[in-house]
Amino acid sequence: MRNVTLVLSDGTKFHGKSFGYDAPVAGEVVFNTAMMGYPESLTDPSYAGQLLTMTFPLVGNYGVPPFTIGESGIPTFMESDKIYVSALIVSDYTEEYSHWNAVESLAEWLKREHVPGITGIDTRELTKVLREHGVMMGKILFDDEPDNIPEADYEGVNFVDRVSTKEIIRYNEGAGKKVVLVDCGVKANIIRSLINRGVEVIRVPWIYDYTGMDYDGLFLANGPGDPDMCNDAVEVIRKQMSMSKKPICGICMGNQLLSKAAGAKIYKLKYGHRGHNQPVRMVGTDKCYITSQNHGYAVDASTLDKDWQELFVNMNDGSNEGICHKENPWFTSQFHPEACSGPVDTYFMFDKFVETLK
């Protein structure tokens, strides 16, 4: 293993060893508190442009499952068809894995996909730095190549345009009610969750004008980066809402885009919510749910138009976790009800959406 150094934008340095693809890289450094689910996290398009730090110390223990495509045409064990994180940062990488479904080690997978991975990092201290000072840009440099310095931007980059489909894709064609899914970086399990409820899914590019299509409901998917870079998508949503009261549901980035269409402003969280243990409360009730989350931006609910209200709030910091219209079947969640990985406490969100189609 080659010696590497993680250099944060404030000058803080962490020393470790390379166990993935040997190439310097730069990106926004974030942390995830989940204890498992690294194959799903690495293939989540919402992590595009980021150096992902896993706070759980042991990573790689159960290897990597095979990449297979199910009958529905979506990946069986991954959330997309490739790794989207720019690099993986762990405390203790485990080379010897053990799992009945594993076909290769995490290191082999990273190398095959040309994604750097570093181990031996004090991820506890790194997380404390990010928690106190906020997420920041970072660079992974190889000690024997001090002049090979990568450059990358995160702010002002439209990552949604990079990860969204470029063509219309249909799943479960002819099955029943038709749902247009706006792909901002959709996870495979969102598509699977809709298909399992007997609907046809029409996946369209994030910038596509679907208002003239024949469909029964609109689903706004998750995605990476700053939602303010997706104003073209917001305008199409506004156009759709002015034309019809067809059901609308959104997840993560979808919550932010629908909120922008409802007049709300978006702000960046200090260090985001990334993990499997985020508690949220349904507004107007005493019901609390444990949720899987992955976002760095939030909705300022106080700026919503008068016809809208909060649906969920985060129990840790009070930030918005979903909105709903007071009359029309339009609602969202900032968290991921499809999980994968993570708790499925809020899986009912898909049931609620499909019920509104009938």
Question: PLM features: what roles do these ranges have?
Answer:
Residues K287-E327:
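Catalytic beta-strand/loop cores that center a nucleophilic Ser/Cys/Thr
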Residues P116, K178, P247-C249, K265, ...:
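Proline-centered loop/turn at the N-terminus of a beta-strand
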Residues G322-K358:
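A glycine-centered loop/beta-turn motif at secondary-structure junctions
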Residues K178-D183, T291-S292, F331-F335:
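Active-site-proximal beta-strand elements of phosphoester/diester hydrolases
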Residues T5, P279-R281, L311, G322:
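Residue-level detector of beta-strand face positions
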Residues M1-I207, P227, E235, C340, ...:
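RNA-binding accessory domains that recognize and position tRNA/RNA substrates
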Residues M213-L218:
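Short acidic/histidine-rich motifs immediately flanking catalytic phosphotransfer sites
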